[in-house]
Amino acid sequence: MPDTFESVLNNVNTHSCPSDLRITDMRFADIVGAPMHCTLMKIYTNQGLVGYGEVRDGATKTYALMLKRLLLGENPCNVDKIFRRIKQFGGQARQGGGVSGVEVALWDLAGKAFGVPVYQMLGGKFRDRVRIYCDTDVSGKPDGMKMGHALKERMAKGYTFLKMDVGTMLISDEPGALSYPTGLWD
């Protein structure tokens, strides 16, 4: 049964008035000891709702904190408006991890405010299960044999979709394998 306007309104958090929701603070929690260091972002609102995002891709909370002044007082349900305002501070560099973390936290807040799963706001449910992949970095794996061993370990854990960041150093000695400006790697 497709959602109707009334059914969506019935799911709205009665302790939240989405149009009056405002961002009041942004804080961070560092997760250490997992497979890698991870910084979680928490965006707080005037109605007690908290949205969570992750600062990723080599970014630090310092980069994400630079965005805080652009968020305070804004309605987190205006995800696209806020994203357009902060995306100039992202890109593919380290700052991008802060911008994407903010966007995830905003969607989390909007879903909580309206009482619906985020996927519902992004076009609806497409499938019941999502296949995940496991990233495998190259550090400590200087050759194909060690990388292959690491990939097999992940497969033994049940992963069926693998990603590896091989880099170019594993094939830099192979004639014709790489094309780059003369003298770049000398």
Residue ranges of each PLM-predicted region?
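Short, conserved phosphate-binding/catalytic loop or strand-edge motifs used
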Residues: G124-V130
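Metal- or metallocofactor-binding catalytic centers and their adjacent structured scaffolds
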Residues: F5, N11, N46-V116
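Metal-dependent enolase-superfamily TIM-barrel catalytic cores that perform enediolate-based chemistry
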Residues: R129, D135-D186
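Residues that line or immediately flank small-molecule/substrate-binding pockets and catalytic motifs
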Residues: D30, D57, V166
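Structured beta-strand/loop patches that form or line metal/cofactor-binding pockets in enzymes
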Residues: F5-Y52
